Amino acid sequence: MQCALYDAGRCRSCQWITQPIPEQLSAKTADLKNLLADFPVEEWCAPVSGPEQGFRNKAKMVVSGSVEKPLLGMLHRDGTPEDLCDCPLYPASFAPVFAALKPFIARAGLTPYNVARKRGELKYILLTESQSDGGMMLRFVLRSETKLAQLRKALPWLQEQLPQLKVITVNIQPVHMAIMEGETEIYLTEQQALAERFNDVPLWIRPQSFFQTNPAVASQLYATARDWVRQLPVKHMWDLFCGVGGFGLHCATPDMQLTGIEIASEAIACAKQSAAELGLTRLQFQALDSTQFATAQGEVPELVLVNPPRRGIGKPLCDYLSTMAPRFIIYSSCNAQTMAKDIRELPGYRIERVQLFDMFPHTAHYEVLTLLVKQ
């Protein structure tokens, strides 16, 4: 992938950009095999990759510069701002949005937040696009509600320029820290969720719900999990750390009982909406802590699917699963180091199958799907 920002030394986020994709995949596979070297693996499936540029469905832009000439991008460690509107990871459809946002920031008087001076209002612009219909969600992260009335007043101009903006919100993040969002979300549009569709499964994206940033690879990840589950004798499963329900909604059949657990209530609202659309009445999604939910249960289903954050599932859940011994565990991980650590805490399970998904090209990161079977 050619990147003028990288070539000019202005951005180093894609540290592997000079390596061809096959070399990147080989290095990631070697890393994964090294991490799982202590465990016999019955089947290594071929790694899955997607487009090498224009694949991201989300932009998280730090707003800097002045209200008349805002910059959208990032801050270097020394505080120097960098405009990243031309980043080739973003699809071409993002360019006109960035182009319209810059004059809009001036029109609405949204002074960019100055980290050094702790002054200003507009901290971040968060943009998400649906692959299914091209609809977009735009979030303005502000320090306070001071400029909210001005923003509302100027908004019709922006909506006229960009009719693809289906969901627009203001998020209030009052703390002087590099935290992307606060708890308060103010909707400026009637529509509150973005419709997405992977493999004929309706999914919903709400402002404060996690959603995979590489749809081409994520849809293959979910489809693979579905294929693996369909090969197993499973009538009841848990989907822990389920997010908007991507795994559970793909894996469920009309006669299967499924419980999905996720701490974020916004994500659970999305999952429930999808389940209702699919007419799956035996799916239950609850906004709870996954570990606390699981360890309070007196029995387990045949299959437990886990998709934890980077820290992994942790010892308490590993101990519980070891004791309760579900027949199958499917572990989806964005951090193979913590996954390997967790598998060590699951004695009595063998690794039936492993597959790497290149969700983050040009970086050392990857996603991995692992099927564990009770010995």
From Swiss-Prot:
SUPFAM superfamilies per record: S-adenosyl-L-methionine-dependent methyltransferases (SSF53335)
The entry's keywords: 4Fe-4S, Iron, Iron-sulfur, Metal-binding, Methyltransferase, rRNA processing, S-adenosyl-L-methionine, Transferase
Entry's Gene Ontology molecular function annotations: 4 iron, 4 sulfur cluster binding; iron ion binding; rRNA (uridine-C5-)-methyltransferase activity
Pfam families xref list: tRNA_U5-meth_tr
Active site (record annotation): 334 (nucleophile)
Record-listed S-adenosyl-L-methionine binding positions: 212, 241, 262, 307
Residues that coordinate or bind [4Fe-4S] cluster: 3, 11, 14, 87
Enzyme Commission code: 2.1.1.189
GO biological process: rRNA base methylation
Catalytic activity line of the entry: uridine(747) in 23S rRNA + S-adenosyl-L-methionine = 5-methyluridine(747) in 23S rRNA + S-adenosyl-L-homocysteine + H(+)
Role description: Catalyzes the formation of 5-methyl-uridine at position 747 (m5U747) in 23S rRNA.
Similarity annotation: Belongs to the class I-like SAM-binding methyltransferase superfamily. RNA M5U methyltransferase family. RlmC subfamily.
Matching NCBIfam families: meth_trns_rumB
UniProt-recorded name of the protein: 23S rRNA (uracil(747)-C(5))-methyltransferase RlmC
Gene that encodes the chain: rlmC
